[in-house]
């Protein structure tokens, strides 16, 4: 099956160049020239890889990365003329998987796409299922089920649940969680972590009231996944 690539770029010359080059490599290519179209194409076409320019006419690409990451973990390669170190760091922190600056080499881009595809394939093949009482987590498909009901989580919520389940019974400090989820330790992210945890607990408990008790808060220390106990 052909991999699907979505190009989000308002420069039609670059879009055409990428479309031709990637189609010759047997990719199924779709395009969007603004953020509004991009959201629609992501929802309808469900691409395997996104190529994103930051200078879109209706929204800054950095904001778009964050919005995309609220509902999907599709790999994103940024291709931008912006070369500032802080911009590159922010794009990666917001959820981009890779960053290339313009002008760029098409063959190098092809190679980076292949790397991302190999990583995605290896994750799919690691089809490990974790169970804890009525909770079931499929790490390969990133699906969560409680009491035969699917739980729809954001990428950050899933990462948080995955981390806790991989260390079931162990108290994970806030610092460790921040490092694993965000890639760095910054105490300013604590409110964001608490919001993700609150939302995660609410979604789990909507499927079964006992689910809220499997994650324990240790004040000023961190969180711990406990064994499921039905009341």
Curated annotation (Swiss-Prot):
GO BP: regulation of DNA-templated transcription
Pfam families named among the record's database cross-references: Response_reg (PF00072), Trans_reg_C (PF00486)
Modified residues (4-aspartylphosphate): 53
InterPro entries associated with the record: CheY-like_superfamily (IPR011006), OmpR/PhoB-type_DNA-bd (IPR001867), Sig_transdc_resp-reg_receiver (IPR001789), WalR-like (IPR039420), WH-like_DNA-bd_sf (IPR036388)
GO MF annotations, alphabetized: phosphorelay response regulator activity; transcription cis-regulatory region binding
Keywords: DNA-binding, Phosphoprotein, Transcription, Transcription regulation, Two-component regulatory system
PROSITE patterns linked to this entry: OMPR_PHOB, RESPONSE_REGULATORY
DNA-binding region per UniProt: 127-227
Induction and repression of expression: By the Agr/RNAIII system.
Domain named Response regulatory: residues: 4-117
CC annotations in GO: cytosol; protein-DNA complex
Phenotypic consequence of gene deletion: Inactivation of kdpE results in decreased transcript level of cap.
Post-translational modifications reported in the UniProt record: Phosphorylated by KdpD. Phosphorylation is required for transcriptional activity.
Domain of life according to the entry: Bacteria
Function: Member of the two-component regulatory system KdpD/KdpE that regulates the transcription of a series of virulence factors through sensing external K(+) concentrations. Also regulates capsular polysaccharide synthesis. Upon phosphorylation by KpdD, functions as a transcriptional regulator by direct binding to promoter regions of target genes including spa, hla, aur and geh. Represses the transcription of kdpFABC operon.
Protein name: Transcriptional regulatory protein KdpE
Taxonomic classification: Bacteria, Bacillati, Bacillota, Bacilli, Bacillales
Gene designation per UniProt: kdpE
């Amino acid at each position: 099956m052909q991999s699907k690539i979505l190009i989000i770029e308002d420069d039609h010359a670059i879009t055409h160049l990428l479309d031709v080059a990637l189609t010759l490599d047997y990719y199924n290519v779709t395009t969007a020239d603004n953020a509004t179209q991009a959201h629609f194409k992501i929802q309808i076409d469900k691409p395997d890889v996104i190529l994103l320019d930051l200078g879109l006419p209706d929204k800054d690409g950095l904001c778009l990365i964050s919005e995309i990451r609220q509902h999907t973990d599709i790999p994103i390669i940024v291709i931008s003329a912006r070369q500032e170190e802080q911009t590159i760091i922010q794009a990666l922190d917001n959820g981009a998987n890779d960053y290339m600056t313009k002008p760029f080499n098409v063959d190098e881009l092809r190679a980076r796409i292949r790397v991302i595809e190999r990583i995605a394939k290896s994750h799919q093949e690691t089809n490990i299922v974790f169970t804890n009482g009525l909770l079931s987590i499929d790490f390969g498909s990133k699906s969560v089920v409680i009491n035969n009901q699917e739980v729809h989580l954001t990428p950050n919520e899933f990462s948080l649940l995955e981390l806790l389940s991989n260390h079931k019974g162990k108290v994970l400090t806030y610092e460790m969680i921040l490092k694993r989820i965000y890639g760095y330790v910054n105490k300013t992210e604590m409110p964001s972590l608490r919001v993700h945890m609150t939302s995660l607990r609410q979604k789990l408990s909507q499927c079964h009231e006992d689910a809220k008790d499997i994650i324990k808060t240790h004040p000023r220390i961190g969180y711990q996944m406990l064994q499921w106990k039905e009341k």
